[in-house]
Amino acid sequence: MVKNYSFYQFIMTVRGRKDDKGVFAEQIFEDLAFPKHEDDFNTLSEYIETHSEFTLPMSVFDDLYDDYTEWLKF
């Protein structure tokens, strides 16, 4: 059975980590305009690329999205 959660809901499980993924999760949490109900990679990627408040490399988002797709399976 696959979970039906948005990327934002997954990101909230990453907040508080002391690594780049945790920092990125905190930046997403602080962005009030972040698309909280979205799960599409391209939509999320475009949003992150066009908003300058995200200071970490896109590779961190890519890794988090991979983690998200794995998390949905369990």
From Swiss-Prot:
Stored SUPFAM superfamilies: YozE-like
Full protein name: UPF0346 protein SERP0997
Organism lineage string: Bacteria, Bacillati, Bacillota, Bacilli, Bacillales
Domain of life: Bacteria
Pfam families: YozE_SAM_like (PF06855)
The family this protein is said to belong to: Belongs to the UPF0346 family.
InterPro entries hit by this protein: UPF0346 (IPR010673), YozE_SAM-like (IPR023089), YozE_SAM-like_sf (IPR036806)
